[in-house]
Amino acid sequence: MQISLSSAQPQAWSGTVLALGIAEGDPNGWIPAMEERFSISLGDWLEQRKFQGKNGESASLQLLNPNCESLVLIGLGPLEALDVNSFRQAGAAAARASKNQTGSIGLLLPWNAVDPAEAVTVAAQAVRLALYSDQRFRSKPEPSIHPERLELLGPLPNTLSSALEAVHPICAGVELARELVAAPPNSVTPSALAESAAQMAHEHGLDLKVLERSDCEARGMGSFLSVCQGSDMDPKFIHLTYRPSGPATKRVVLVGKGLTFDSGGYNLKVGAAQIDMMKFDMGGSAAVLGAMRSIAELRPQGVEVHMLVASCENMINGSAVHPGDIVTASNGTTIEINNTDAEGRLTLADALVYASELEPDAIVDLATLTGACVIALGDEIAGLWTGDDSLANSLEGAAKDAGEGLWRMPMHQAYRKGLKSLLADLKNTGPRPGGSITAALFLKEFVRSSIPWAHIDIAGTVWSDKGRGMDPAGATGYGVRTLVSWVCAQTQQAEN
């Protein structure tokens, strides 16, 4: 999609869909001007539909005018209550109203109600992401009909064009994550994830190292390798690195859970466990791969970014790990596997040990880890666990800037006793109450205490059955925008 600024006023703009933001309490807005332009009684028409400009309201009118085929009015709510997220919602509403039409969208919102650079950027992102459609696996793909151009209208300075330069890289990263999560497990395998990383490395000049099973064995990754014992698919440990063109004063590691399919193992998923949806158990890896796709194009300076994904399947055969087996992670910790369906933390354990060996300034992992987090926070908010207040604040700020829900949860150390094993150093699961907390405490065992580390559980946010806002139904690409925002903030810190 081509995105540009236009100084044209709505009275003179020509295109396919003209979308105007109407604030609550401002009943006239652009309505008189539109009535004059199109010779219609727009006010009466809106009154019949009881349109008041409330947040979430919208009204569309087919004009059959050669210079403007459709008029879309988007309710913004009270003008004084507008925030950056209001512009995301408005952009998504404009996109939804423009589906099945070609040509261009002209979008006019009260850009100066917030930082105009932020407003135009998030609105443009929302339009593009809301128009996303995945037709890859249909024998007869439905034509994806939508406008090819977006013009942001109003008296905006041309300097804001530079703010729009980040729209494509960020959206491309989100779209990659959506594609990876949505694809079936016979398409996205551990090898396919490694191939995706290889393609990215080739196209964007990143460094790539892929550890095969023998390499992981040599490094003592018994925790990770125990998970893939029952699969015919070879595991892949993927290490992708972005290095800035100038000196790097910060190094961060992004770790993503990469279970391309999770049967639960001998603790087989049944009933509400949604075994049919366990293709999305690699949502963490999709998020970090998508973030690296964006970072590679944005080229932030001053920060070196490492991405780690320990990818495999959790399947059942005669060689699969048993409940009760004891394995040894690469830091020497012994783990009693009392639940084979708590496998993600076993793969992350060795990934976090590896991440610590890189001696970074911070480690952030993303994982579809626990159903307990979904019960606690639902499907719009991810959980954040960290013992580092500074890291928590920076991630919460990045998530807010990105428009992604994130809520800090307690690292209640007293629950650590629930991981005690009679035979090994620890068990991989604790009691059912507080399950998302004990999962985070388990992961903490594999991170050097001197390194700031955060765990983000995206089990609820990775998928949307019905769609919401700028996320059509299906994979959301959650986490990409937050990670990119956070990494770019590291650049600013490095400059200071």
Swiss-Prot record:
Enzyme class, broadest EC rank: hydrolase
Cofactor note: Binds 2 manganese ions per subunit.
Needed cofactors: Mn(2+)
Residues that coordinate or bind Mn(2+) 2: 257, 262, 281, 343
Source lineage: Bacteria, Bacillati, Cyanobacteriota, Cyanophyceae, Synechococcales
List of residues binding Mn(2+) 1: 262, 341, 343
Family: Belongs to the peptidase M17 family.
Any one of the GO BP annotations: proteolysis
Cellular component, GO annotation: cytoplasm
Name by which UniProt lists this protein: Probable cytosol aminopeptidase
Gene that this polypeptide is encoded by: pepA
Family annotation (PROSITE patterns): CYTOSOL_AP
